[in-house]
Amino acid sequence: MKITSLLLIGAFTLANGNIWATTGHQDSIERLRMSSEVLHSIVETPDKGIPEEVLSNAKCIIVIPHLVKGGFIFGGEHGRGIATCRTAEGWSAPAFVSIGGGSWGLQIGLEGIDLVMLVMNDQGFQHLLSNKFEISGDASASAGPVGRHASAGTDWKLNTEILTYSRSRGVFAGITLDGAIVEQDNDSTRTIYGRELTFRTILSGKVAAPKSTLGFMKAIAATDHTATIAEAKPDKE
């Protein structure tokens, strides 16, 4: 009887582990897909999107799809997304991120708000490589300019490390994210890469992008006609 019970418990635990692994992989793939859609919208709506000059000067792009749902403020929950940075060989493989806390300045009633953060200089890049940082605490940030001619000003070129944007119903707007914490999503990293990898390893271009991330990498390249992407490799099983 005891042996039977132990076998049942073991089988149940194994089944739950397999279900969690499958769900985690599907969630990570879906996040890549939604992030790609946000990037496509940047290219398709130049008059209402992020200025080309701003994008071309960005060292890293972070996309957090569907930050707000169901008419509630983001609050204490964690949004999750994807980051990639420029390297000598092109855009790096994608790193999985999470974000939470802080004062978002979002209005109740908005649905499907996507967040885009552009890291604009080396100091901001180093903060991102640290695996965890606080916006406006560790890294300076400001709402980014919007529209084809919005980049004419020079404020964003001076000392801002990160420019932040929200997107709702296809329209981009600058947003403040004071106090928000950005950190690595270790679970999704293990799920897609099959091992522990730091932000620094991924975003410095030291690993190739898995094949399951190719759609996202193509979407990133489409935002920058001069960009290239690393050769993809099979996912880790």
Question: Across the structure, where does each feature detected by a protein language model lie?
Answer:
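Bacterial N-terminal signal peptides
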Residues: 7-15
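Sec/Tat signal peptide C-region and signal peptidase I cleavage site
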Residues: 16-22
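Small-residue-enriched, tightly packed secondary-structure blocks
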Residues: 22-237
